């Protein structure tokens, strides 16, 4: 109700203000003087604006009413009823039931530590060469017998040394032979990798074998290639020489390897 009354009151005030302003404007409009009309018109417009600003009232928002809740009545201390505590029941043990004996934990046995791995077998030590013992010379023997015994000792020493040398040569020759064979195969593979079949000879279905000799330097380089046996076709011979000249060193030349080598290069069509 209060809000509606306020809104009606504001509306009436605004209508009155607007009526006053309109009447004032009409009154000023009827005056004959143009200058006075212009001056009064300016004054009237300024007054009307001020009146409008003053008359427009902002309606205040209604304040919320504070609703006070009634405090709940606190219970009187005398009327509070305490809940009865449950009676404690005494547990009577049955004498016929024997208590179970507590199990005693046995101490854990320590696990035996793993023994260390056995060390590797000791390397066989090189056997020492057993020197032939000198036979004692009997002083009682005559001079002729002494000469015979001394010559026998010399022969024994010579035989042992010659046998040792022969064994060493056999062992050394075995290792040298394998190394030389491997080096020879490496040179052969290097030459074959650079072998190119001439196109013209291939079209004409020409085949043949070329024997070529060349020098092997200390660093393994190949040089001085020449044909020792022709294949019968000049293009095949030239292809064999080119393969050797283009080949690279496969390593230093091993001891005992010849400084010159001869190989046979085949050109065949399948």
Curated annotation (Swiss-Prot):
Is rRNA-binding one of the keywords UniProt gives this record?
no
Sequence ranges of Polar residues compositional bias: 169-178
Q: What segments bear the compositional bias annotation Basic residues? A: 114-126
What Gene Ontology biological process does one annotation of this record name? siderophore transport
Kindly report every residue range on the membrane side named Periplasmic.
Answer: 28-270
Q: Where is the composition biased (Basic and acidic residues)?
A: 82-113, 127-146
Q: Which residues cross the membrane?
A: 8-27
Tell me the outcome of changing residue 31 to K. Answer: In strain: TN106
**Which superkingdom?**
Bacteria
Keywords of the record, alphabetical order, are: Cell inner membrane, Cell membrane, Membrane, Protein transport, Repeat, Signal-anchor, Transmembrane, Transmembrane helix, Transport, Virulence
Q: Which family does it belong to?
A: Belongs to the TonB family.
What the protein does?
Interacts with outer membrane receptor proteins that carry out high-affinity binding and energy dependent uptake into the periplasmic space of specific substrates. It could act to transduce energy from the cytoplasmic membrane to specific energy-requiring processes in the outer membrane, resulting in the release into the periplasm of ligands bound by these outer membrane proteins. Required for heme utilization and virulence.
Q: Could you identify this protein by its name?
A: Protein TonB
Gene name as annotated: tonB
């Amino acid at each position: 109700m209060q809000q509606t009354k306020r809104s009606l009151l504001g509306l009436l005030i605004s209508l009155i203000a607007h009526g006053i302003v309109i009447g004032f404007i009409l009154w000023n409009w009827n005056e004959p003087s143009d200058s006075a009309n212009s001056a009064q018109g300016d004054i009237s417009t300024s007054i009307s604006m001020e009146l409008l600003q003053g008359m427009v009232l902002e309606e205040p928002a209604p304040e919320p009413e504070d609703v006070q809740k009634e405090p709940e009545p606190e219970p009187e201390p005398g009327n509070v009823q305490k809940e009865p505590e449950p009676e404690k029941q005494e547990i009577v043990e049955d004498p016929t039931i024997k208590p179970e004996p507590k199990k005693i934990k046995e101490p854990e046995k320590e696990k035996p530590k793993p023994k260390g791995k056995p060390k590797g077998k000791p390397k066989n030590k090189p056997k020492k060469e057993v020197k032939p013992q000198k036979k004692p010379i009997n002083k009682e023997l005559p001079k002729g017998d002494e000469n015979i015994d001394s010559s026998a000792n010399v022969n024994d020493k010579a035989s042992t040394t010659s046998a040792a040398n022969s064994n060493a040569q056999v062992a050394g020759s075995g290792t040298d032979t394998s190394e030389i064979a491997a080096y020879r195969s490496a040179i052969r593979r290097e030459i074959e990798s650079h072998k190119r079949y001439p196109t013209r000879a291939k079209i004409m279905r020409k085949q043949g074998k070329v024997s070529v000799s060349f020098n092997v330097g200390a660093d393994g380089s190949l040089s001085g290639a020449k044909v020792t046996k022709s294949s019968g076709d000049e293009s095949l011979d030239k292809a064999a020489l080119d393969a050797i000249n283009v080949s690279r060193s496969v390593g230093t030349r091993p001891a005992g390897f010849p400084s010159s080598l001869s190989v046979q290069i085949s050109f065949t069509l399948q």
